[in-house]
Structures are given as C-alpha cells and as structure tokens.
C-alpha cells in the first residue's frame, strides 16, 4: 500500500467528525440533561441528521479510499475504515429516525440506548482513527486518547449548543453539563501533558 494512502482515511474521518460531532454529542448527552420525555424530545429537535448529508459524504469518501486500496482488504487499516463506515451509517440512521419519530425515541430507555451506542461508536471511531494514524495498531495509546477525547468533546459541544438553544430548566442543566465537561476535558489535557512530560 502506498505510504501516502493512510493519510486519506484520517482526513475523511477528521472532516466527518468536525461536521458531525454535534449530533453524536446530542445523542450522547441527552439522558444526562433531560429529565422526562418532553425534554428528551426537545433535545431530539436539535438534531439535524441527514439534512447536512455529512454521513453520505463520509460514506462516499471512505468507500473510495477502501475500493482504491484492494490490497488492504482484510488488514487492520481496511478493517478500521469499515468500522468507521459501519458506526457512521448506523448512527446516522438512528438519528434520522429519532428526528422524525420523537414520540417513540423520546422514551428514557431508548434515549439511554442511543447514548450508550453513541459512546461506544465514538470509541470505535477513536480506536479506528488511532489505527489510521499509527499505520494499523488498533489498540494504540493514540487510539485510547482519541476515544476518550472524542466522547468528552462531543458531550461538551452538545451541552454548549443546548445551553444556547434551550432557555428553560433543561437549558440550565445543559449549562451545568457544559461546565462539568469543560473541567473534565481540562483535567484530561493536564493529565495527558503530565504523562507526555514524564
């Protein structure tokens, strides 16, 4: 495989996360800030899945990369690309359904399920991104760091967005969640700086 090739999956992944991290974060944060079905539906109303076509853009881009490197089929790099595609497709489909069927997806149990899936999916994306960056090492330190950071960053972004867009007590809880996640992210970066220094 061309040594330049692994750059492109990472580029597509980075652009996808830049564009789609808010929707992942809203799905992740909803059970932590919403207290009832109406508040769950208010969070779901902030989702804009499918409309921006971010998932379609990612699928198109990474599919081109995967098909352009047939020799990679079966190796860790190829598996990482396929893992990202899979969680992106399922996550996008869930958010599209949730946006259109708020009464069904607004239940506490389903929202917790979506939150759990979002957290696990961001871990998969993080480990896959680490694999792309390290040339195939799936369980690398880079992947672990990216995975935790993705969850924190997506949660923080969603909490900030909810705090700005929602004005009732739900908005207050979003502001509190943003403050807590900001402190956690600061501690995370300080911890990483300490480890790197050591």
Predicted features, each with a name:
Residues 5-17, 76-90, 138-153:
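Alpha-helical transmembrane segments
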Residues 30-43, 70-77, 96-112, 162-174:
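Membrane-interfacial helix termini and the short, flexible loops that connect transmembrane helices
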Residues 50-118, 132:
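Membrane-interface helix-loop-helix modules in multi-pass inner-membrane proteins
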Residues 1-53, 59-62:
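N-terminal signal-anchor module of multipass membrane proteins
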Residues 6-7, 59-72, 187-196:
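Membrane-embedded alpha-helical segments in integral membrane proteins
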Residues 18-25, 92-97, 149-162:
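Transmembrane alpha-helical segments that form the membrane-embedded catalytic/substrate-channel core
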Residues 101-198:
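Long, contiguous internal "core" modules enriched in hydrophobic/ aromatic residues
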């Amino acid at each position: 495989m061309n040594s330049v090739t692994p750059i492109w999956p990472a580029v597509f992944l980075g652009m996808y996360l830049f564009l789609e991290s808010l929707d992942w974060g809203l799905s992740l944060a909803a059970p932590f800030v919403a207290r009832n079905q109406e508040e769950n539906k208010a969070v779901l109303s902030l989702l804009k899945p499918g409309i921006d076509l971010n998932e379609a853009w990612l699928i198109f881009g990474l599919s081109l990369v995967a098909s352009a490197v047939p020799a990679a089929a079966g190796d860790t790099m190829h598996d990482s690309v396929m893992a990202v595609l899979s969680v992106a497709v399922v996550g996008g489909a869930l958010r599209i359904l949730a946006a259109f069927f708020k009464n069904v997806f607004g239940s506490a149990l389903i929202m917790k399920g979506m939150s759990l899936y979002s957290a696990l999916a961001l871990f998969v994306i993080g480990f896959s991104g680490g694999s792309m960056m390290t040339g195939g090492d799936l369980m690398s330190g880079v992947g672990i760091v990216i995975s935790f950071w993705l969850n924190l960053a997506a949660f923080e972004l969603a909490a900030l967005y909810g705090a700005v867009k929602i004005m009732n007590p739900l908005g207050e809880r979003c502001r509190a969640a943003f403050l807590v996640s900001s402190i956690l992210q600061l501690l995370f970066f300080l911890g990483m700086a300490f480890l790197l220094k050591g």
